């Protein structure tokens, strides 16, 4: 009996101090002088993040479409799944930038309010490539609008963000648009000459397979 009481007392001795020493961290006040991004610039960046996530979801839908057994175009599927990953990475880069500038300390959930893909099927590869090119053009225009909002602010010209978007994002966008336009042109020429077989050949070339 005494041994049971000793064990019980030992448990209490361990548990009570543990509950008494729980870590309660009070909020701290940090100077805000270093947070210099203005509202119009910040809001346009948040909208751009949503657009990048939306583009990623649309590319996922495109990849899923070309992965269907009744479509079976693995080259196109891989192309669009890779594009989805790139758009997601763009969104992550923008989020990381805002965090570096002291933003996104609250109301992060609004960034997740993204509309679902507008389309889920395409007649063929040409239509899908042209849709992708149109979507990338819209993303490029949106980035230019962000640059304008952050550059033309009468109170604060955000040179650093403008330089970041111009150097890292716009160049990649322009190269991506040119690549999609070239792919669409090549596919159209193949299909003009070989009809449906042309799309099959092009799909294999996307996988690096010579036919």
Swiss-Prot record:
GO MF terms, alphabetically ordered: ferric iron binding; ferrous iron binding; ferroxidase activity
Signal peptide feature range: 1-20
GO biological process, one term: intracellular iron ion homeostasis
GO cellular component: extracellular region; Golgi apparatus
Binding site for Fe cation 2: 87, 136, 173
Binding-site residues for Fe cation 1, renumbered to this chain: 52, 87, 90
UniProt-listed Enzyme Commission number(s): 1.16.3.1
Keywords, sorted A to Z: Disulfide bond, Golgi apparatus, Iron, Iron storage, Metal-binding, Oxidoreductase, Secreted, Signal
Subcellular location as annotated: Golgi apparatus; Secreted
Primary location: Golgi
Catalysed conversion reaction: 4 Fe(2+) + O2 + 4 H(+) = 4 Fe(3+) + 2 H2O
Enzyme class: oxidoreductase
Domain of life according to the entry: Eukaryota
Domain Ferritin-like diiron: residue ranges: 35-191
Disulfide pairings: 41-150
Keyword Disulfide bond: yes
Homology family: Belongs to the ferritin family.
PANTHER family assigned: FERRITIN
General function of this protein: Stores iron in a soluble, non-toxic, readily available form. Important for iron homeostasis. Iron is taken up in the ferrous form and deposited as ferric hydroxides after oxidation. Ferritin is composed of a heavy (H) chain which is responsible for the oxidation and uptake of ferrous iron, and a light (L) chain which facilitates the nucleation of the ferrihydrite iron core.
Assembly, per entry: Oligomer of 12 light (L) chains and 12 heavy (H) chains; L and H chains are disulfide-linked. The functional molecule forms a roughly spherical shell with a diameter of 12 nm and contains a central cavity into which the insoluble ferric iron core is deposited.
Protein's UniProt name: Ferritin heavy chain
Species name: Trichoplusia ni
Phylogenetic placement of the source organism: Eukaryota, Metazoa, Ecdysozoa, Arthropoda, Hexapoda
GN (gene name): Fer1HCH
